[in-house]
Design a protein with these regions (language model features):
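Core segments of cupin and vicinal oxygen chelate
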Residues: 2-51, 88
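Residues in flexible loops and secondary-structure boundaries
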Residues: 15, 20, 40, 54, ...
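Conserved short beta-strand elements that form part of the metal-binding/catalytic scaffold
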Residues: 30-67, 112, 116-122
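Preference for short coil/turn "hinge" residues that link or interrupt alpha-helices
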Residues: 49, 72, 90-93
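Residue-level preference for alpha-helix termini and adjacent loops
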Residues: 22, 69-72, 99
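Vicinal oxygen chelate
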Residues: 1-15, 33-36, 45, 62-85, 105-110, ...
Length: 126
């Protein structure tokens, strides 16, 4: 299926990666791969059959919400324009577009009701 704006990545935000990682790896048979995320600490990749399928990160000052939760990313072609459009449509930019090395550009916006969604303009590996 070649769909426009698909959900392309899921990420767990938790202050206890060890407990959450153990839980989900045992529940679903996922493997864990930890990588250094610099100032953000450890980023953990959930893997199945050697493929990255989701991520896990520590909360940051820019991370919307409280407690542990999952969030999803929707692919967009032009993240800067999409963030501007979100504001024009009555939403808010919660985390401005910024680069993530080897991933692309990401941001978080909310709709007028407060529902949060994360956007990603993936790096072009072609």
């Amino acid at each position: 299926m070649n769909e426009k704006n698909p959900f392309i990545w899921q990420e767990l935000v938790t202050s206890d990666q060890e407990t959450s990682g153990t839980f989900f790896s045992k529940l679903f048979g996922w493997n864990l791969k930890q990588v250094d995320a610099g100032k953000f600490g450890t980023y953990t990749l959930f893997q199945k059959e050697g493929q990255d399928i989701a991520g896990m990160m520590n909360p940051t000052v820019d991370t919307p919400g409280e407690g542990s939760y999952w969030h999803s990313y929707i692919a967009v072609d032009d993240i800067d324009n999409c963030a501007k459009q979100a504001e024009l449509l009555g939403g808010k930019v919660l985390v401005p577009p910024h680069d993530v090395p080897d991933v692309g550009r990401i941001c978080a916006v909310s709709d007028p009701t407060g529902a949060v969604v994360h956007l990603m303009q993936p790096v072009d590996n072609s």
